Structure formats: structure tokens, C-alpha cells
């Protein structure tokens, strides 16, 4: 298990910067969205999906998914209902 705690991703990283075309866009996720994104991506990595960040082999799939979220390279989008 990596030394990253659940709180380190759920509690502190509220904004993620992603490229949309040539623009750098700031995405704000709720803690529930972040948990779902990281969990889904960790499952994909555990099932053999390619890793999108530099991995030195020390991190487990959850740690890799957290690093991908911090880097803003996770290929998962969030669709919200319009209020």
C-alpha cells in the first residue's frame, strides 16, 4: 500500500487542471466525485489499463490513480445535472 492516505486526495486536492484542446481548464470536483474517479481509475489500472503518469513501480493502483488525478490526465469526465 502506498503512503498516501485517503484524506490526502479527498480532502486537499479540490481543483484539477486539464487540457481541453489548447486551453488549460480548472475542474472543481466534490469529494464524492474525486473518490469515484480515483476508485474507477484504480480498478482500470488493476485490470491492466496503461498507466498515464511516470510509474517507478512503488505505487499500488490506488496511488497511481491519485497521482494521475493530481496530474490531470485521467480520461474520465463528470457529467452533472443542470440545476
Curated annotation (Swiss-Prot):
Catalytic activity of the protein: RNA(n) + a ribonucleoside 5'-triphosphate = RNA(n+1) + diphosphate
InterPro entries according to UniProt: DNA-dir_RNA_polK_14-18kDa_CS, Pol_omega/Rpo6/RPB6, RPB6/omega-like_sf, Rpo6/Rpb6
Keyword Transcription included in the entry's annotation: yes
Transmembrane segments: none
Primary subcellular site in the record, as a coarse category: cytoplasm
Function per UniProt: DNA-dependent RNA polymerase (RNAP) catalyzes the transcription of DNA into RNA using the four ribonucleoside triphosphates as substrates.
Listed EC numbers: 2.7.7.6
Family statement: Belongs to the archaeal Rpo6/eukaryotic RPB6 RNA polymerase subunit family.
Any one Gene Ontology molecular-function term assigned to this protein's record: DNA-directed RNA polymerase activity
Quaternary structure and partners: Part of the RNA polymerase complex.
Domain of life from the UniProt record: Archaea
SMART domains found in the cross-reference section: RNA_pol_Rpb6
Localization annotation: Cytoplasm
UniProt protein name: DNA-directed RNA polymerase subunit Rpo6
HAMAP family noted in UniProt: RNApol_arch_Rpo6
Any one GO BP annotation for this protein: transcription by RNA polymerase II
Gene: rpo6
Keywords assigned by UniProt, alphabetized: Cytoplasm, DNA-directed RNA polymerase, Nucleotidyltransferase, Transcription, Transferase
GO cellular component: cytoplasm; DNA-directed RNA polymerase complex
Amino acid at each position: 500500500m502506498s503512503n498516501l492516505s485517503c484524506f490526502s486526495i479527498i480532502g486537499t486536492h479540490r481543483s484539477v487542471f486539464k487540457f481541453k484542446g489548447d486551453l488549460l481548464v480548472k475542474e472543481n470536483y466534490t469529494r464524492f466525485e474525486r473518490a469515484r474517479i480515483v476508485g474507477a481509475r484504480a480498478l482500470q489500472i488493476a485490470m491492466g489499463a496503461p498507466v498515464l503518469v511516470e510509474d517507478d513501480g512503488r505505487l499500488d493502483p490506488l496511488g497511481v490513480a491519485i497521482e494521475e488525478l493530481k496530474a490531470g490526465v485521467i480520461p474520465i469526465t463528470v457529467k452533472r445535472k443542470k440545476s
